Amino acid sequence: MSSKHRAVVKDKWKMKKWYEVVAPTSFGGITLGSTPADDPEKLIGRVIETTLYDITGDITQVHVKLYFQIISIDGNKALTRFKGHELARDYMRSLVRRKSSKIQGIFDINTKDGYVLRVTIVALTSYRCNTSQKKAIRRVMREYIFKKASELTLDELVQEIMSYKISNEIAELARKIYPIRRVEVYKTKLLLIPSPEGPKPAVVISPLQAREE
């Protein structure tokens, strides 16, 4: 590498500033990490992956992957919004047992404050169940999660998912139909956010990208 090229690379790093990536207030507003950029607008739209363990310090939550998206810059802080979560596949595989059934439901739900969230719920039975019992359990999931979402804000709903309150309540209702070993909210994804013009896709585009388009 020529000395001139090394100088250019060095100068580019000198131009960069470090920004503190901050979790939403619903996750305590803690620092998720830091990232460099020569232009803060380049950070907008970037997705940050972490785990619930990194936020709470509880090692039993290391399998819960969280996704936050940078939506704005405030001074040297990159502010984020919850984008979704997913349980580690190895963890989900460890829950599966022979001679039992797995019932999955995917629902697009509306929160009280106008967000639309796609939720994937998985119920694992103690024994193998029949088709009609699976349908009944899936119906319990649907009725419960639609009602619950309509009563809570997005932040409240996400916290009840993370605390296993929703999983436990669904399991309790489903056990009236068939023995349930476990219920997990396997995955969530933010689809729509409220706006004065009505719900709009939860897509964050960097101002730089918008100008290029």
From Swiss-Prot:
- State the GO CC annotations: ribonucleoprotein complex; ribosome
GO molecular function terms listed in the Swiss-Prot or TrEMBL record: structural constituent of ribosome
A Pfam family of the record is: Ribosomal_S3Ae
Q: Per UniProt, which keywords does this protein have?
A: Ribonucleoprotein, Ribosomal protein
Q: Per its UniProt record, what PROSITE patterns does this chain match?
A: RIBOSOMAL_S3AE
Keyword Nuclease listed? The answer is: no
Q: Name one GO biological process term.
A: translation
Would I find Ribonucleoprotein among this entry's keywords?
A: yes
Question: Which InterPro entries does UniProt cross-reference here?
Answer: Ribosomal_eS1 (IPR001593), Ribosomal_eS1_arc (IPR030838), Ribosomal_eS1_CS (IPR018281)
Reading the lineage from the top rank, the first entry is Archaea
Family per UniProt?
A: Belongs to the eukaryotic ribosomal protein eS1 family.
Q: Which HAMAP family match?
A: Ribosomal_eS1
Query: Could you tell me which PANTHER family the record lists for this protein?
Result: 40S RIBOSOMAL PROTEIN S3A (PTHR11830)
Protein name as annotated = Small ribosomal subunit protein eS1
Question: What organism is this sequence from?
Answer: Desulfurococcus amylolyticus (strain DSM 18924 / JCM 16383 / VKM B-2413 / 1221n) (Desulfurococcus kamchatkensis)
